[in-house]
């Protein structure tokens, strides 16, 4: 049976100072999805985040942007899943990936934290690694040749996209939303086959 998500979570940090950072690309994907379906995400204290309900491919889907800050994202997701009695396995988590080049997506059915603190928090609070993720690449230029690690990752992910990177960012966000739509319609596995090999051409550094 196809794994079709009914909850889409975009990871990021709240606050205007973080809004345009690379680390917030998960938030921006969710905003793009909400705009496509003309719905408004609203803050709900019960869920420690901004939420909306939308019909996608005829299915009711809940959107969530945790406003707990990245490192506590799991608190928000756990609250929503517990309230609606929904399984973690049907949650698709959208987040940035500093090991993937900007313009690339990678869907995974499950896995470890991959060094991402938002994913780490979800695993800790929901007590499982068994949930699909949509990783959105943010690496660009010299970053593609660097080793990712705690020492150099933080300044990069909390930095802002350059004008060159911003030139393709809208297309990247649209591609990510397309992948979400197909995941909901046909299952994450089908979307993996279609989108894991696709990329938006990178601009020249």
Curated annotation (Swiss-Prot):
Subcellular compartments: Cytoplasm
Marked site positions, Stabilizes the basic form of H active site to accept a proton: 96
Assigned protein family: Belongs to the PTH family.
An MF annotation (GO) of this entry: tRNA binding
Function: Hydrolyzes ribosome-free peptidyl-tRNAs (with 1 or more amino acids incorporated), which drop off the ribosome during protein synthesis, or as a result of ribosome stalling.
Entry annotation: catalytic residues: 23
Entry keyword set: Cytoplasm, Hydrolase, RNA-binding, tRNA-binding
Protein name: Peptidyl-tRNA hydrolase
Protein's UniProt keywords contain tRNA-binding: yes
Gene3D superfamilies on file: Peptidyl-tRNA hydrolase
GO biological process: protein quality control for misfolded or incompletely synthesized proteins; rescue of stalled ribosome
Binding site for tRNA: 18, 69, 71, 117
Site (Discriminates between blocked and unblocked aminoacyl-tRNA): 13
InterPro entries xrefs: Pept_tRNA_hydro, Pept_tRNA_hydro_CS, Pept_tRNA_hydro_sf
Keyword Phosphoprotein: no
Catalytic activity annotation: an N-acyl-L-alpha-aminoacyl-tRNA + H2O = an N-acyl-L-amino acid + a tRNA + H(+)
Top-rank taxon: Bacteria
Subunit structure and binding partners: Monomer.
NCBIfam families linked: pth
Species, as recorded: Thermosynechococcus vestitus (strain NIES-2133 / IAM M-273 / BP-1)
Gene Ontology cellular-component terms listed: cytoplasm
UniProt EC number: 3.1.1.29
Chief localisation class: cytoplasm
